[in-house]
């Protein structure tokens, strides 16, 4: 269809348009349909309409084509042409409106028209200027058009999400498919209304509401799915971090446990670093390297040690004898602050050597106790032909007692092996060894303090009752026939050889410590013994503050039947507890 630029009439073909122009406009007087301009030919009228009234003339004729440009349906070349014409028309129309003089009713001719020469001369110049300016703006228009087309997206239905090609199709879709939603509910009517529980939209149909809510749920499920994926990833990461932390913790615990185990092995001499012989040789070599021992002395001592180990008898190089006799003389002639003192039977002091330094206190205390028993005729039957054994021999004797069936729990703890190790021994091993020799003894466990500040006054009272059967009427110095007492606490052991009672009734133990070297003990052998020399022997109540103490006290000789009974009882080892 073709439309006449002058009157707007539409014809079906180009020949019809030519006939229309000839008959209607060229043969008759041409009059502007907008401003009544007349007296011009056809070409001039077309130019006038194109420049002065293009917007009014094209508004209805190009409405559809302009919409097509806005929705991006036409090709780029046609869109650019139409957009350019629309811009030109708008600008020319505004230019005409601003530049042409206002025409009042009095200035118009009686027939209501304007002559060509009155109008043409005023607007022709402005029209030509505008056409030149539009040529410069055409390139900008094309750029704007491409940007607009790039940013455009097809319209989407707000109810169901369907996408249409243009706004007219979308409007048709909404009117046909969602007409119920477009109706405004009437007041005071009985029509049921359905509110969306999520966004508050009012629907007149339950099925429409259901579709609308389904859209909400789809969006929500998508978001929840994303959240679930994220949560799953977070949970997986948290589990990995927890597993890594647990692995590191277990590894650290295993490392610390191994270090503690190795420390205990070294502490108790079970680290396979050798026993008495190896340590003796190693320490003597160190002394030679430091210049403290001559090589000839090293070889002499090594030979003596090998001989001692071969016969199983202590070489006596760490022994100090005669101390008990020296103590008796001292208390008889001095010690004015002492009310009464009880001394054990004769006993030799043994101290640690290069071979057992740091772990041999239990063995040295046994040597002290055995040295006293060997001087007592009451134990000759049990200790017939025995001498004070060396430390490796004592280890062998304890292993033999385990083999007889004594203290299986203790044997298991030490892997049934003492020889060739630096394993410590305590009250249980001393009891086991003495019982296997048919020496009657008892273990008393002072498992907790019985006095203020962690002291053990009950321990002192028990030792006093052991040595002093009758305190009143006895002389100041009492030399008893009782053997010394083995005294054990955590990490160390000593031998109790007597007890003092001060004039203020306080008690003080006299103990031999295997950690005290011979040169210090020999100071007690002097006739003019000083009080300061006794300081290393005296232990008051306030000096013994360990949490637990155990003592092994000898009480006589066992018969063969009693030995068997005690061996059976040692299967589950128990001790007398005080308190």
From Swiss-Prot:
Residues 250-275 are annotated as: zUBD/ZHA. One of its GO terms (cellular component) is nucleus. It catalyses: Thiol-dependent hydrolysis of ester, thioester, amide, peptide and isopeptide bonds formed by the C-terminal Gly of ubiquitin (a 76-residue protein attached to proteins as an intracellular targeting signal). GO terms for molecular function: cysteine-type deubiquitinase activity; zinc ion binding. A zinc finger (C2H2-type) spans 2-25, 30-53, 155-178, 194-216. Pfam families: Peptidase_C78. InterPro entries: UfSP1/2_DUB_cat, Zinc_finger/UBP_domain, Znf_C2H2_type. SMART domains: ZnF_C2H2. PROSITE patterns: ZINC_FINGER_C2H2_1 (PS00028), ZINC_FINGER_C2H2_2 (PS50157). Residues 227-249 are annotated as: MIU. Keywords: Acetylation, Cytoplasm, Hydrolase, Metal-binding, Nucleus, Repeat, Zinc, Zinc-finger. It is an enzyme of class 3 (hydrolase). The motif interacting with ubiquitin (MIU) and ZUFSP ubiquitin-binding domain (zUBD, also called ZUFSP helical arm ZHA) are responsible for binding the distal (outgoing) ubiquitin units S1 and S2 respectively. C2H2-type zinc finger 4 is a ubiquitin-binding zinc finger (UBZ) and required for polyubiquitin binding, possibly binding the proximal ubiqutin, and for catalytic activity. C2H2-type zinc fingers 1-3 are required for localization to sites of DNA damage. Interacts with RPA1 and RPA2. Belongs to the peptidase C78 family. ZUFSP subfamily. Deubiquitinase with endodeubiquitinase activity that specifically interacts with and cleaves 'Lys-63'-linked long polyubiquitin chains. Shows only weak activity against 'Lys-11' and 'Lys-48'-linked chains. Plays an important role in genome stability pathways, functioning to prevent spontaneous DNA damage and also promote cellular survival in response to exogenous DNA damage. Modulates the ubiquitination status of replication protein A (RPA) complex proteins in response to replication stress. This is Zinc finger-containing ubiquitin peptidase 1. The lineage of its organism: Eukaryota, Metazoa, Chordata, Craniata, Vertebrata. The gene is ZUP1.
